[in-house]
Design a protein with these regions (language model features):
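Interfacial helix-loop-helix linkers and transmembrane-helix boundary segments
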Residues: 26-33, 52-61, 83-93, 118-121, ...
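Membrane helix-loop-helix hairpins that form the core translocation module of multi-pass transporters
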Residues: 32-81
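Select subsegments of transmembrane alpha-helices in polytopic membrane proteins
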Residues: 35-41, 95-106, 154-158
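Interfacial loop-to-transmembrane junctions
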Residues: 141-159
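Juxtamembrane boundary at the C-terminal end of a transmembrane helix
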Residues: 163-173
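Structural signal for alpha-helical transmembrane segments and their flanking helix-loop junctions
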Residues: 1-29, 90-140
Length: 173
């Protein structure tokens, strides 16, 4: 998996427009900031544990990339066709944890991509690949870009990139 594919994968797996749409109206910047920090910590943990996890279940990095692409594709199809329901959220800054960090931003596709990406490129490249997605999420939230059409566009882009991640895994086998 190239670093470019990992960056694009993280952007579409997180889907900044979907995250901006889920941000609480009261204080979206603070919630997105908390969520971004939480997601970064979770990505580092998933990346650091990638090799032991994959070894424990007997899965290769290429197979993990295929699984990541399939998980990303499921989220992308959901974003493309289903309007997100408002998630119940914790009060104040805690809304950045639930629902923003989990389950909106650190969805199964992001978790699998973090594991697959770190096994292939290392944790440092994984973290560097996650930062653009978090910056775009903050920009989308501050600009109020969480509209249904943009969420669907993010889903369409996600389906394309997810397919590329699956193909990357298949070609690596």
């Amino acid at each position: 998996m190239t670093a470019t594919l990992l960056v694009l994968g993280m952007i579409v797996a997180i889907n900044p427009f979907r995250a901006a749409d889920a941000a609480p109206e009261a204080d979206p910047r603070r919630a997105i900031g908390v969520a971004g920090l939480a997601v970064l910590v979770l990505v580092v943990i998933a990346g650091a544990l990638s090799e032991p996890l994959l070894s424990a279940v007997g899965v290769t990095g290429a197979s993990a990339r295929i699984a990541a692409g399939i998980a990303m594709l499921a989220s992308a199809v959901r974003d493309l066709f289903v309007s997100p329901d408002p998630e119940p959220s914790l009060p104040g800054w805690r809304a950045g944890i639930v629902p923003l960090a989990f389950p909106v931003m650190f969805a199964p596709g992001v978790a699998m991509l973090a594991i697959a990406g770190a096994s292939n490129r290392g944790v440092a490249v994984l973290v560097a690949s996650t930062l653009p997605a978090l910056v775009l999420t903050a920009l989308a939230a501050s600009a109020g870009l969480g509209r249904r059409l943009l969420v669907a566009v993010g889903g369409a882009a996600g389906a394309l990139i997810a397919t590329l991640v699956v193909l990357d895994g298949v070609y690596a086998i």
